[in-house]
C-alpha cells in the first residue's frame, strides 16, 4: 500500500516503546520511547524555545535535565494527559499525518481494565477526531505476524508479560494468563544488583543507562546454578560497559542474574510462577485435544524475549514440565521485537477486517462502551 492517503495507522503503544506506522508496511516507521520528560530546572536563556515537556527521543536526549515519566505502567495508562502528548507526537511529529483522515489501530494487553480501552476510544474519537478505530490484543497480533492461526504466544514487553493460547484464530480467554513482571522490573532489579557491586544508579536518567546495559549485555543462562559456579570460578563471563561520562564498569554474573528473574520471580519478591510455568499453566487450562498443537507452536514475542539463550532455556524448562513424549517447539522469530506492530499492519490491511472498524458514527450512537462489543 504505497498511498498513505487511505492507509490505516497502526500504533502499538508499549509501556516502554511506542511503535507506529502505516498498515501494509513491513516495519514501523517510528519507534521511540514512551516517555514524557519535564525540566527539573528553571529556564534562564530566553528565546531558546524551551518547552514545558518533551516526548520520546527528544526527552531521551535531554534526559540529563529532565524528570522522565512513563505514562503506561504494566500495560495500563496511568497518566492520560501524558498519553495524549505521546499520541499527538506520534501523529504530528513522527508520522506527519492528520489523524482525522486515517483509521487508527491501537493495541493493548489482555486482561486490562475495561476503562482503559474505553478512554483510549474516547480520546481517539473526541480529541483526534479519527474516522474509525480498533483496539487489538497484542499477543494475537504477534501470532498473525508469525503466519500461524494456532499457537500459544508468550508476549513479554516492558510493562507486562502474558500468555495467550489461540486455536484456529480464536483466542481462548479462560486460559489467558498475565504476569506483571517484565522489562522494567528487570531494569530495576539490575539497578539494585549493580548497587551491590558499588555502582549507584538512582535517577530516572540513570535508569535509562541501566536499561541500555541490560539490552546490550544480559543473557539467559541455560543452567543457572552452573553459570553461577562458572562466574565465581573465572572472569570469563565478565564484560565491560562504558558509561556516557567515559567511566568503564565491569559486570559479571549480573548479566544472567537479571533475566533469571523471568524464571524465578522470587528474586524480586514476587510470589508468582515464572514465564515457563505460566506458559505451561496456560496450556493446561486449554482443552486436552489442542494442547499438542500449542506445545508445538510456542511463539515468543516482545522486547523482553530478546535475551540471547531465552528460547533454549524455555525449551528446556517446558520439556521438563510437559509429558515426556510431547514435541515441544519454541519459535523465536528474529523480528519479534516488532511482531505486535507487524501483526497490526497485516490485520489492518486485510479486506475482511474493513467491516470490523468502529466508525465515528457508531461511537456517536453508542459511546465508548462500543469498544467492548466490537473488539475482542
Swiss-Prot record:
- Spell out the subcellular localization from the entry: Cytoplasm; Cytoplasm, Cytoskeleton
The residues of the propeptide are 1-2
Q: What is its EC number?
A: 3.6.4.-
Residues where N-acetylaspartate is found: 3
Which InterPro entries does this chain map to? Actin, Actin/actin-like_CS, Actin_CS, ATPase_NBD
| Chemical reaction(s) catalysed | ATP + H2O = ADP + phosphate + H(+)
Q: Which GO terms describe its molecular function?
A: ATP binding; hydrolase activity
Its GO CC terms?
Answer: cytoplasm; cytoskeleton
Q: Does the keyword Transcription regulation apply?
A: no
Tell me the keywords, alphabetical order: Acetylation, ATP-binding, Cytoplasm, Cytoskeleton, Hydrolase, Nucleotide-binding
Q: What is its main location?
A: cytoplasm
The answer to whether UniProt assigns keyword Cytoplasm to this entry is: yes
The protein's superkingdom reads: Eukaryota
Q: What does this protein do?
A: Actins are highly conserved proteins that are involved in various types of cell motility and are ubiquitously expressed in all eukaryotic cells.
Q: Name the family.
A: Belongs to the actin family.
This chain belongs to the protein called: Actin, cytoskeletal
